[in-house]
């Protein structure tokens, strides 16, 4: 499938599910299950319930998607705290 065929939508994470999946409600009200994209997983980007995200979906299955971006809100109530790194 070509990358041009994918649909990008904005949404909000409602619930964190097992196996690094998330229940996301899109701006149009549609609910789907999404997983984090590879680059987000590689860079250890954390997604919490209530975060605004961009979801990429296939036009053939609109019930599943991939989270490709987490939007940072300027007036966020939770401060940014980097993850602790332990020497191995």
UniProtKB/Swiss-Prot annotation:
CDD domains: S1_IF1
Gene Ontology CC: cytosol
SUPFAM superfamilies in UniProt: Nucleic acid-binding proteins
Gene Ontology MF, one: rRNA binding
InterPro entries assigned: NA-bd_OB-fold, RNA-binding_domain_S1_IF1, TIF_IF1
Keywords: Cytoplasm, Initiation factor, Protein biosynthesis, RNA-binding, rRNA-binding
Pfam families with a match to the protein in the record: eIF-1a (PF01176)
Domain S1-like: 1-72
Keyword RNA-binding appears in the UniProt entry: yes
UniProt cross-references to Gene3D superfamilies, sorted A to Z: Nucleic acid-binding proteins
Record's subcellular location: Cytoplasm
Keyword Cytoplasm: yes
Role played: One of the essential components for the initiation of protein synthesis. Stabilizes the binding of IF-2 and IF-3 on the 30S subunit to which N-formylmethionyl-tRNA(fMet) subsequently binds. Helps modulate mRNA selection, yielding the 30S pre-initiation complex (PIC). Upon addition of the 50S ribosomal subunit IF-1, IF-2 and IF-3 are released leaving the mature 70S translation initiation complex.
UniProt record similarity statement: Belongs to the IF-1 family.
Assembly with partners or alone: Component of the 30S ribosomal translation pre-initiation complex which assembles on the 30S ribosome in the order IF-2 and IF-3, IF-1 and N-formylmethionyl-tRNA(fMet); mRNA recruitment can occur at any time during PIC assembly.
Protein name (Swiss-Prot/TrEMBL): Translation initiation factor IF-1 2
């Amino acid at each position: 499938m070509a990358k041009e065929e994918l649909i990008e939508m904005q949404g909000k994470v409602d619930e964190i599910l097992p196996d690094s999946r998330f229940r996301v409600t899109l701006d149009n009200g549609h609910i789907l299950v999404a997983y984090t994209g590879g680059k987000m997983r590689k860079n250890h980007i954390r997604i919490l319930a209530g975060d605004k995200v961009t979801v990429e979906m296939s036009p053939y299955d609109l019930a599943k998607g991939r989270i490709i971006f987490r939007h940072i809100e300027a007036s966020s109530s939770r401060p940014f705290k980097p993850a602790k790194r332990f020497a191995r």
